């Protein structure tokens, strides 16, 4: 649902912050 989409987006941003070396897919 909408919350899941938001969670995915936030999770992606967090991953970018914690693992900047990981290229965004």
Swiss-Prot record:
Keywords: Amphibian defense peptide, Antibiotic, Antimicrobial, Secreted. This is Aurein-5.2. Expressed by the skin dorsal glands. GO terms for cellular component: extracellular region. Its main location: secreted. It holds the Pfam family Antimicrobial24. Has antimicrobial activity against L.lactis and S.uberis. It is found in: Secreted. GO terms for biological process: defense response to bacterium. It comes from Ranoidea raniformis. The keyword Secreted applies. The keyword Mitochondrion does not apply.
């Amino acid at each position: 649902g909408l919350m899941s989409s938001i969670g995915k987006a936030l999770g992606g941003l967090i991953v970018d912050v914690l693992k900047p070396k990981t290229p965004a897919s």
